[in-house]
């Protein structure tokens, strides 16, 4: 029998990982991601861990464990996983790279266009001053966001030192900061000593000082990419600046003082669409089958299968339809409703949204639909 410990927030977990789909005896133990601890591993001795970004995969979790052979993260980001350590231990790690790239890009576009609806027409064909969208980080999400911006006729100022120069990777970070109308962050969280260009506190007092006070800042990557202390100081000096945060430096706790200064704030749900979450589960399921199925350890007598197509209902949301009817934006995604839910969760006595309440908002989130782009 294969034993799996899985984050209970993984979409359609039991539709994918069961004895019928795998044709093999299997035990799936689901729990909150923050409860996947060394003690839990000691108790259940799992062969497989299926996680999301709240579970830290490192020596603290795994040093005393000898049972885990496969770790799948149903997320784009990997900064919660010490990949060097995992490799050293001979474990296989996979993530769901790109699974929610359209979901996050659509979240960013929703934020921009709900706050600045005039940008629908601020393009190269209708304006002599088209919107300049600055994108820092041009991986799966950043490059997808650029496609939406270019489709609206906006100008993209992109910066990614790890990508080759291109139509969208076309600016220095200084130019992005100084000349963008909106800046959207799409970088992993890396620390000094672990990267040539660490992103921890990339947006600090110096970076904020280079941005015009009218520049909107959006962060959907990792909270600590932005220094919240410096951001709060900047917002006190420049109250007109619009800032949208989906991630927070001290997540899952969110300061009420900071929240009060933000234009929009949501509980780390930018990628939370039905399509994005299902795609993440499908991707780690496929990788699991490759590891344990006919191409791998021959434990499972099955091949990869596309369950996602069977689980998705019809999708009425199309990007081109929204472009033709901008007034329907809130019907496609009402970002302000998610903002209200987070603000309503502030514990006045603590002066913050508590971690338990933040996690509950994520766990109970009604998944929105991803718009069809092409």
From Swiss-Prot:
This is Erythronate-4-phosphate dehydrogenase. It comes from Psychrobacter sp. (strain PRwf-1). It is found in: Cytoplasm. GO terms for biological process: pyridoxine biosynthetic process. InterPro entries: D-isomer_2-hydroxyacid_DH, D-isomer_2_OHA_DH_cat_dom, D-isomer_DH_CS1, D-isomer_DH_NAD-bd, Erythronate-4-P_DHase, Erythronate-4-P_DHase_dimer, NAD(P)-bd_dom_sf, PdxB_dimer_sf. Its main location: cytoplasm. Substrate binds at residues 53, 75, 272. Homodimer.
């Amino acid at each position: 029998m294969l034993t799996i410990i899985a984050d209970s927030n993984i979409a359609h977990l039991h539709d994918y990982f069961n004895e019928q789909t795998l044709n093999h005896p299997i035990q799936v133990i689901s729990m909150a991601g923050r409860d996947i601890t060394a003690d839990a591993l000691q108790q259940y001795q799992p062969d497989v861990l299926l996680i999301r970004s709240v579970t830290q995969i490192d020596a603290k979790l795994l040093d005393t464990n000898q049972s885990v052979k496969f770790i799948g993260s149903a997320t784009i980001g990997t900064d919660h996983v010490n990949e060097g350590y995992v490799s050293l231990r001979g474990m296989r790690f996979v993530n769901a790279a790109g699974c929610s790239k359209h979901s996050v890009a659509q979240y960013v576009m929703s934020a921009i266009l709900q706050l600045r609806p005039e940008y629908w027409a601020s393009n190269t064909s209708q304006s002599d001053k088209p919107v300049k969208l600055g994108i820092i980080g041009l991986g799966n999400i950043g490059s997808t966001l650029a496609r939406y911006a270019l489709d609206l006729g906006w100008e993209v100022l992109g910066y990614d030192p790890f990508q080759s120069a291109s139509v969208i990777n076309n600016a220095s970070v200084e130019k992005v900061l100084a000349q963008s109308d909106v800046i959207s962050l799409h970088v992993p969280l890396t620390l000094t000593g672990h990267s040539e260009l660490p992103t921890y506190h990339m947006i600090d007092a110096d970076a904020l000082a280079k941005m015009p006070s009218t520049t909107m800042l959006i962060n959907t990557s990792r909270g600590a990419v932005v220094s919240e202390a410096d951001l709060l100081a900047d917002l006190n000096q420049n109250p007109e600046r619009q800032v949208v945060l989906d991630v927070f430096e001290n997540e899952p706790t969110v300061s009420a003082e900071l929240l009060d200064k933000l234009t929009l704030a949501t509980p780390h749900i930018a990628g939370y669409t039905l399509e994005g979450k299902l795609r993440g589960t499908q991707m780690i399921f496929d990788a699991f089958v490759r590891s344990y199925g006919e191409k791998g350890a021959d434990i499972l007598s099955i091949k990869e299968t596309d369950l996602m197509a069977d689980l998705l209902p019809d999708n009425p949301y199309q990007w081109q339809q929204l472009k033709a009817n901008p007034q329907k934006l809130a019907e496609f995604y009402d970002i302000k409703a998610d903002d209200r839910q987070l603000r309503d969760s502030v514990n006045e006595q603590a002066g913050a949204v508590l971690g338990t309440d933040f996690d509950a908002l994520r766990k109970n989130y009604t998944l929105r639909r991803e718009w069809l782009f092409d």
